[in-house]
Regions:
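N-terminal glycine-rich anion-binding loops that anchor highly charged ligand groups
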Residues: 24-39
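N-terminal basic/disordered segments at the start of proteins
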Residues: 1-27
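Helical "lid/coupling" subdomains associated with nucleotide-phosphate turnover
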Residues: 3, 17-20, 36, 40-69, ...
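A short acidic Gly-Thr/Ser loop motif
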Residues: 7-12, 130-136, 144, 224-227
């Protein structure tokens, strides 16, 4: 059975085509396009007409492709920008005209779904997954208990158990911070950069504090999303982008700081020319 899933975030819209047999994904093809649906939403709480147009156009091409490939079902979910926007129903009508039943999912569901996908690479390890998007960051702590621990957990041999201990969605993302602190300008000011740092540090510290009250400390921090993958791509100067070289890679705090300094020192045009950074990501 071929299934299609469309995920519409604040910055990107994604399509996954998955061949599923006996409840398992056998093959998957992924497609990503930057549509910037959340442009201006942090300030106005409304989706721009041109952003809706970009998004519906992208999704229309995704639906056409999925149906040509023989997808038996197409699921469409929307996240942070749609959650925040008062006129999200306008977008919903456009998507419904394509034959979809779009669902705006809560941040906690978004986080749990992300964790489900990520945890298969870290079976039997307690991990903290941070899915940093354009408008929000989902933090999830938990463990995918695999067959090696079946006797301990009382599962049937070969079974798996998803044990999520903490999940929270924080209104903190690259587009939200960029727009609130004018970070898309050429050479953003030290004051604006410091303001973004303080906001991020406070919100993340509070969320991590709540996690510490609810569960044991994780073994690993796993970064997910376009911000995390872009950091690796810029550091390693990937051109063209190669997901195989990004997946399960590592990056240090010092390296993140160096890349931040590099981006802050450049004009928008210069950021567009940085090897490894998608041109449409340069403004955020």
């Amino acid at each position: 059975m071929l299934l299609a899933a469309i995920d519409i975030g604040t910055v990107t819209a994604r399509l996954a085509l998955a061949q599923v047999e006996d409840g398992r994904v056998i093959r998957m093809a992924k497609y990503t396009e930057i549509v910037n649906l959340g442009e201006g939403v942090d300030k106005t709480k409304r989706l721009l007409p041109e952003a809706i147009h970009r998004c519906v156009g992208c999704v229309s091409s995704y639906v056409d492709h999925a149906r040509k490939e023989g997808a038996e079902a197409v699921v469409c979910t929307l996240t942070s920008a749609a959650r925040d926007a008062e006129n999200a129903p306008d977008l919903g009508m456009g998507l419904a005209s394509l034959g979809l039943e779009p669902m705006i999912i809560p941040g906690e569901i978004e986080g749990a779904l992300t964790f489900l996908g990520v945890s298969h690479d870290f079976e039997n390890h307690r991990i903290l997954v941070a899915d940093s998007g354009g408008g929000s960051t989902e933090l999830v702590v938990g463990t995918l208990v695999g067959q090696a621990a079946a006797q301990v957990t009382g599962q049937q041999p070969g079974g798996q158990q998803l044990d999520i201990n903490f999940v929270e969605s924080v209104d903190l993302g690259c587009r939200r911070l960029t727009e609130r602190f004018n970070l898309s300008l050429d050479h953003p000011s030290a004051e604006d950069i410091d303001g973004a740092h303080q906001m991020a540090a406070q919100m993340m510290s509070e969320a991590i504090g709540r996690a510490q009250q609810q569960c044991a400390a994780p073994e690993l921090l796993v970064g997910v999303g376009g911000t995390a993958t872009s950091l690796i791509a810029v550091r390693d100067r990937l051109n063209p982008y190669d997901p195989a070289k990004v997946h399960l890679n590592h990056i240090s705090i010092d390296e993140v700081s160096q890349i931040e300094g590099l981006l802050a020192s450049k004009t928008l045009k210069e950021r567009e020319d940085i090897t490894g950074l998608q041109v449409k990501r340069a403004p955020v």
